[in-house]
């Protein structure tokens, strides 16, 4: 499933993050039933698990883990929570 964040997207500032959140919400409106974690409870559980496992996820994709406070990292975390098991 293609999501609201492409692999090379960078979320450089608050405005870009707000635009990403709008795309994420639109993706949920259009594709929510297809998300692995369509309820808030499951989404938050997956978000927690993905953030905890994110060093391995970034390593598996050949990327360096961004520094703390990186907007793109948070966007990746929210995107991953849609499908992370």
Model-derived segments and their meaning:
Residues 2-52:
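Amphipathic alpha-helical packing elements
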Residues 60-85:
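Amphipathic alpha-helical binding modules
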